[in-house]
Amino acid sequence: MKLNSVLTLLFIALFTACKGGAYDLSGYGLKPDTGENASPLIAKALQEIAAEVNFDTVRILLPKGRYDFYPEGASKREYFISNHDQDNPKLVGLAFENMKNVIFDGQGSELVFHGRMLPVSLVGSENCTLKNFSIDFANPHISQVKVLENDTVGGLITYEVAPWVEYEIRDSNFVAKGEGWEHVPAWGIAFEGDTKRLVYTTSDISVGSKHVAEIASRKILAPWKNKKLIPGTVVVFRGYG
């Protein structure tokens, strides 16, 4: 009797997870707005779905809400990505591999990643659609600063670090920090503070991240010569990767 009950419950769970070519990820244990790590659950779900799909078109449905992804339990993949750092394996939040005729519908969900992760990969697949979700990082790998003063004669710029950026001044270097990562930014992109457009005739620029001093809370004085960075300019720092 117990065996029959277990088999019945298993059948119901499978039927709930997959119905008419649609896989509801809640049937794999994924629940929104809990703050819990969704990485191992979605890794297991996508692996199982890829192994058993037998419909012309498959829909994978993620109940609307916020999902947090952490490196622990995430899919590990070896990818070599153009214009990207080449450390491997990479930790992937949603790894879509060897899939065909798949529609992934996040139904308006917010996917928030923590640490150093690759949010989504789509490899060896065809005719796939990923839609209705947003991607963000709890602590982005870029650092935003605003130019306060620019001494073009002395080659010094004073800038203010955005309140959400984690950093420290270590050995006179501006060190951006996050969950499981840190770097001294090497390059940046400059935006006009009022219009948010790229500063005219600029692309990647070198940034003042070395030999700096913190002269007040979140205010940095740096040897940095660039006459185009007028006060109010917003610069987004990034590393090499």
Language-model region placement:
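Extracellular beta-strand-rich solenoid/capping regions of secreted or surface-exposed proteins
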Residues: 43, 47-52, 68-103, 112-131, ...
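Long, low-complexity, polar/charged, intrinsically disordered or flexibly structured peripheral segments
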Residues: 186-241
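A structural signal for beta-strand register positions
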Residues: 66, 108-110, 134
